[in-house]
Design a protein with these regions (language model features):
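Gly/Pro/Ser/Thr-rich low-complexity, intrinsically disordered segments predominantly at protein N-termini
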Residues: 2-160, 164-224
Length: 224
C-alpha cells in the first residue's frame, strides 16, 4: 500500500499596513535668485497658510495640513500657558517672515515668540531684522523632512532657541558660538522639562485640549 502525504495549503495571512496621515506637503524650487524669492513673498502676500524658506538659491514651499497645524496650535497654547505660569511676558509673532537681505536667507517658522526681548517689540507692527532682534524662540513642526536646512537659516538670523517637533519627539536647540546644540532643558523655561510636551498632545486627543491644558498647568506648577 502506498500512502501519499499531501501538503495542506497554507492559509493566506493578512498583512496589516499602518498608514500615516499626511501632515504637510513640501515643494522644492531650485535656482531661484534672492530677488525672485522676495518677489514671491510680495506676490503671495501675508494672508496664506504656506510657509516659505530660502537658502542658497533653493526655495521650499510647505503647506500644513490638519495634523501639522493642530500640533502647531496646541504647542503654542502650551507655550503661552508656560509663560503665564512662570510670570513671563510673551509676544506671539506666528509665522513671521524672517529675512535678511545682507545674508540672502529667509524662513517662516510655524510659530515664533518674543519672550526675553518682548519689551523691545511690544508695540511694533513690523519687524526689521537689520534693526530689531529676531524672535527668542521659533518652532518648526516637521512630520516630513524639510528640503532646506533650517539650522543654517536660523543660525544666520541668530535665533537663540529653536524647537523641532517631528510628530513624536520635541527637540530643543540653543545657539552658541554660531551653531546649535541640542539641550535637555530650555533656557527660557528653566527647570520645566518641556521635551515632555508631546505626551500632552497625545492626552489632548483623548481628553480634549482644554482639559489637557489644565492638566499641563498643574504639571508645570510641580517644577516651579
Amino acid at each position: 500500500m502506498i500512502v501519499l502525504l499531501l501538503q495542506q495549503p497554507k492559509r493566506a495571512r493578512k498583512i496589516m499596513v499602518a498608514t500615516v496621515p499626511l501632515a504637510e506637503t513640501r515643494i522644492l524650487l531650485e535656482n531661484i535668485s534672492w530677488q525672485t524669492f522676495k518677489a514671491m513673498l510680495a506676490d503671495m502676500g501675508s494672508g496664506r497658510n504656506t510657509r516659505l524658506a530660502y537658502d542658497k538659491g533653493t526655495v521650499e514651499i510647505m503647506t500644513p495640513l490638519m495634523p501639522h497645524e493642530s500640533s502647531n496650535r496646541f504647542i503654542e497654547g502650551l507655550i503661552v500657558a508656560l509663560c503665564e505660569e512662570l510670570g513671563l511676558e510673551v509676544r506671539r509673532s506666528g509665522s513671521l517672515t524672517l529675512t535678511r537681505d545682507d545674508l540672502g536667507k529667509g524662513g517662516e517658522p510655524d510659530s515664533s515668540y518674543y519672550i526675553q526681548n518682548e519689551a523691545l517689540v511690544r508695540d511694533k507692527e513690523n519687524i526689521d531684522l537689520e534693526k530689531d532682534p529676531p524672535p527668542d524662540l521659533v518652532l518648526e513642526v516637521e512630520y516630513s523632512r524639510p528640503k532646506v536646512d533650517k539650522f543654517k537659516i536660523y543660525t544666520a538670523i541668530a535665533v537663540p532657541e529653536f524647537w523641532r517637533f517631528n510628530g513624536t519627539v520635541l527637540r530643543i536647540y540653543t545657539l552658541s558660538n554660531g551653531e546649535y546644540s541640542e539641550v535637555e532643558l530650555s533656557p527660557t523655561f528653566g527647570s520645566v522639562p518641556v521635551r515632555e510636551i508631546p505626551r500632552f498632545l497625545q492626552d489632548a486627543k483623548k481628553n480634549g485640549e482644554m482639559a489637557t491644558t489644565r492638566a499641563f498647568r498643574g504639571w508645570v506648577k510641580g517644577y516651579i
